Amino acid sequence: MSASPSLPASQGPLPQGERVNKAGRVVWFTGLSGAGKSTLATALFEELSARGEAVELLDGDAVRENLSKGLGFSREDRDTNVRRIAFVAGLLAKHGVTVLVSAISPYADTRREVLASLPNALEVFVDAPLEVVTERDVKGLYLKALAGEIPHFTGVSDPYEAPENPDLHLRTDRISVEDGVQQLLGRLSDDR
């Protein structure tokens, strides 16, 4: 039995007058497993928390373990998982929270659907070539998928439909985490 993925400590609710961000927003990180979605989202979470923003991180692995347990990896199950994440993100954003979603969310039409339903949503494409994510994969899942041992593996035996027009495109094989966070902060301040 595997341990449940850990969640970062929550920034407690701030009284309405003390909130830095009055309107909530959703930053949706999408990309292949190992591209750096969770790494960037966690680093941004820490920075926004330090600035006093009400912020939450919804990590795809943690959501799958806690909210979407029992779902498989069919197209329908993946879409259901993405819609559940979007529902929770929307509830939080409605109450002035900046929500960082880190989820593969492989299908473009489902991403468009959920992003259109969310307030102040930004789509961030976290991009790294298959060779790079395979090298980063400490569990060896990509090698197993490439050998045919893992069916329905996004980017290998199941499609990943890259965003055509993301709000921000971060190529993590070319930039540092710090550079990525600075680009994200710049984009977030542009949208305020």
Curated annotation (Swiss-Prot):
One of its GO terms (biological process) is hydrogen sulfide biosynthetic process. CDD domains: APSK (cd02027). Pathway: Sulfur metabolism; hydrogen sulfide biosynthesis; sulfite from sulfate: step 2/3. This is Adenylyl-sulfate kinase. Its EC number is 2.7.1.25. It holds the Pfam family APS_kinase. The active site is at S105 (phosphoserine intermediate). GO terms for molecular function: adenylylsulfate kinase activity; ATP binding; sulfate adenylyltransferase (ATP) activity. It comes from the Bacteria. Keywords: ATP-binding, Kinase, Nucleotide-binding, Phosphoprotein, Transferase. Catalyzes the synthesis of activated sulfate. The keyword Nucleotide-binding applies. ATP binds at G31, L32, S33, G34, A35, G36, K37, S38. It comes from Deinococcus radiodurans (strain ATCC 13939 / DSM 20539 / JCM 16871 / CCUG 27074 / LMG 4051 / NBRC 15346 / NCIMB 9279 / VKM B-1422 / R1). It is an enzyme of class 2 (transferase). Belongs to the APS kinase family. It catalyses: adenosine 5'-phosphosulfate + ATP = 3'-phosphoadenylyl sulfate + ADP + H(+). InterPro entries: APS_kinase (IPR002891), P-loop_NTPase (IPR027417), Sulf_AdTrans/APS_kinase (IPR050512).
